[in-house]
Amino acid sequence: MRCHAPMLFLLAVVMAAAPGLPAAEPAAFPRTTIDLGTVVGDLEKSARFYTEGIGFRELKGFDVPADLATAAGLTDGKPLAVRVLVLGDGPAATKLKLMQIAGTSPRGGDNEFIHSHTGFRYLTIIVADTDATLARLAKLGAKPLARSPVELPASLGAGMHLTCVRDPDGNIIELIGPRK
């Protein structure tokens, strides 16, 4: 299996630098980062992957009662127990919310390649040390896809490498950082 993320990453950099349409009127956001929620098949295994393997820190989670989850359109009458993981410090830190909903058997998508189906396809995480991150992930059974880590062109950052791995549910995780 090949990871097509290097081309997508390069395309994103080129598009960001290219002149385009005039910017829309700026919207006011109290926080400029987003949180990402993901339903997982094995909550403990996923929490270990992201904390012990990648380096997220776990914060206090929260519960969403069934009536609220239903009224909001999140579930069909099932409560949610959410584990919150964070990268960084402070209120603007990136948060990953892991959920496993009791009594359900969610279907996995076709995650062979990022172009296999539409929707959010991968997470990009900038790491301080690619080799150390891969060593931690190897202890959890994760290994790089295809021939990664691959060195990125110097124009994208001298000494930066791109590595794709899969989380316990098969989602592609793109790691970018130096090898030490």
Predicted feature locations:
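A short, acidic/glycine-rich surface segment
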Residues: 66-71, 105-111, 153-154
